[in-house]
Regions:
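Active-site loop-to-helix "anion-binding N-cap" substructures in soluble metabolic enzymes
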Residues: 1-255
């Protein structure tokens, strides 16, 4: 847990799971379980077709509903894509950008991640920006260099003022959906590296104010130990965000 009272953010990434009916049932189940737990923000990022149902179910609760991706253009001939303007018109405040699965399977690059980030921020959205190293980079000892370069490229031309609406999610790619988890020490070290890079870009005050999540197989068993680290300010949760009891246990660990 951070010592400077940065806002802790526990965000679920549902990925390609939950129909609208399933999302409604899940939100109705978890609403009372996380009610009153206000020491952290609780967010679920949902597939586009599920957002409206999740929003309706979450009304009156402390749960916020976000999106899992956004396109960088405001409109145009981009079949299958959704713009930040469209999302904000639907009342969506948060969006995940640059998730490792988007980079791996759909050709996202640091350049397109940067374009999407700037488009979302320009539309007034809050961005959960994902970055992290692959296994070979970790084993080669170049994790710091990789995440430093990603941070700089993904945030190119993003202003210090806009950084108020950016959350960084450090996700070691080798730990996504594998059951492997960075040790609390590895998570702390790399989140600390990201914060140092942010300080070099925006100054110490801005860097110290930014929430940095850990996102690599965080679950109900390891959350408390990870969240106890000074530079780990929350979690971006995949599999455990689909099970109300598991996600609630992570929220409890953040209290």
């Amino acid at each position: 847990m951070n010592p400077l009272k940065r806002r802790t953010v526990i965000a679920g990434n549902w990925k390609m799971n939950f129909t609208p009916a399933e999302a409604t049932a899940f939100i109705n189940e978890i609403k009372p379980m996380v009610a009153g737990k206000d020491n952290c923000d609780v967010i679920f990022c949902a597939p586009y077709v599920t957002i409206a149902a999740a929003q309706e179910a979450a009304k009156g609760s402390n749960i916020k509903i976000g999106a899992e991706n956004v396109h960088f253009a405001e409109k145009g001939a981009y079949t299958g894509e959704v713009s930040a303007k469209m999302l904000t018109a639907c009342g969506v405040e948060y969006v995940i950008i640059g998730h490792s699965e988007r980079r791996q399977y759909f050709g996202e690059t640091d350049e397109t991640v940067n374009l999407r980030t700037k488009a979302a921020l320009a539309a007034g959205m809050k961005v959960i920006l994902c970055l992290g190293e692959v296994k070979e980079q970790r084993l080669s000892g170049i994790t710091d260099e990789v995440v430093a370069m990603q941070t700089k490229l993904d945030l190119q031309s993003v202003t210090a003022e806009e950084m108020k609406n950016v959350i960084i999610a450090y996700e070691p790619v080798w730990a996504i959906g594998t059951g492997l988890t960075a040790t609390p020490e590895q998570a702390e070290e790399t989140c600390g590296t990201i914060r140092k890079v942010l300080a070099s870009m925006y100054g110490e005050d801005v860097a110290e104010s930014i929430t940095i999540q850990y996102g690599g197989s965080m679950n109900e068993k390891n959350a408390a130990e990870l969240l106890a680290k000074p530079n780990v300010d929350g979690g971006l949760i995949g599999g455990a965000s689909l099970v109300a009891e598991k996600f609630t246990a992570i929220v409890d660990a953040a209290q």
